[in-house]
Amino acid sequence: VAYKYFKDSELACKHTGENGMDVAFMKVIEAIREECGFPFRVSSAYRHPTHPIEAGKQKPGAHASGKAIDILVSMEQAFILVEVALKHGIIGIGISQKGPIGTRFIHLDMDKSRSRPRIWSY
């Protein structure tokens, strides 16, 4: 699937190279990106269940379902991203806004198999 704002390589699992992103979820992310009006730098998207982060969990997380993405963003843009994501029905939001600016991110997901809606910090 081709997306307007994202390359397959940035959505693929960094462990296997497989892209298992959910198409309906990505349509929502594309709409959020469009409304935000600034580029999204992806730090993590799809993670195959064998990815070291997922393999260490009792049950694979939202990234393994293809319904989660982590966007490197901070300060005012982080606020805008959360505001727009909520408008578009995102039900899982993880906030990591400590440390160097370039490492801060917002996790967005729509994994209804998990306890949602939720917001948490890392």
Task: Give a label for each model feature.
Residues 1, 14-22, 37-39, 56, ...:
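Generic structural signal for short, solvent-exposed loop/turn connectors between secondary structure elements
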Residues 1-33, 101, 112, 117, ...:
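Extracytoplasmic cell-surface/polysaccharide-interacting catalytic and binding patches
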Residues 1-16, 53-69:
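Short, conserved helix/loop micro-motifs enriched in His/Cys and acidic residues
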Residues 6-8, 33-39, 70-73:
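Generic detector of short, locally flexible boundary/turn motifs and exposed helical patches
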Residues 20-22, 47-52, 71-73, 84-87:
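A short linear-motif detector with a strong N-terminal bias
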Residues 24-28, 38, 51, 67, ...:
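Amphipathic alpha-helical interface surfaces
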Residues 27-57:
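Extended, low-complexity, intrinsically disordered C-terminal regulatory tails
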Residues 60, 65, 69, 73-122:
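Catalytic cores and adjacent binding grooves of peptidoglycan-active enzymes
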